């Protein structure tokens, strides 16, 4: 009887442990979204630092879980925009290393978010010798994220953004449309809906650039015919 009770308590405590981790991660994601989308830019740096400290503590408590490590990397990377150049460069290198560590632990964690974030870092970071920016690695990571989560808002949006940055407009349009129609998570409606709005703006920009390119091509053809 005592043994059965002991086993039941162990199972219950491990379940509570998992739920506490999930709750903590959800709170971190909600707070990050609030800082990123709603906090005035001049106040974001201190808020990110405060949230980063909490996330680092959570990662220490759960060293075998990839999720807190991914969030530590995300916060470091987004806070880099509010730091001086030297500190920002150090931060994105640290974020990259954290994401690689998270992938080693569990590549499927957070529906492949480590690959999304790492891919985004690869195409936004400065190239060698200053940074580690690499278009080929970026696309590989973002495509891996899509294989893990083909219907995700973030996986489709950020691959679309990568394609847009490389002037691959037709492909970018397709992935922005997928991001817009992807289902939002009930527990993170605010963050997901804000990213959907960004996808709509990106799609509008993509179509505008396509139209400009078409007009430019038509003008070139017209001018060449006039010369003849």
Describe the function of each predicted region.
Residues 41-56, 88-97, 131-136:
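Helix-turn-helix repeat elements of alpha-solenoid scaffolds
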Residues 181-228:
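Terminal, low-structured helical/coil segments at or just beyond the last alpha-helical repeat
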Residues 63, 107-109, 150:
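Short coil turns that delineate tetratricopeptide repeat
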Residues 68, 112-114, 155, 189:
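TPR alpha-solenoid repeat register
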Residues 17-54, 58:
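N-terminal leader/linker segments that initiate helical-solenoid repeat arrays
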Residues 96-100, 133-139, 169-187:
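TPR/TPR-like (Sel1-like) alpha-helical repeat modules
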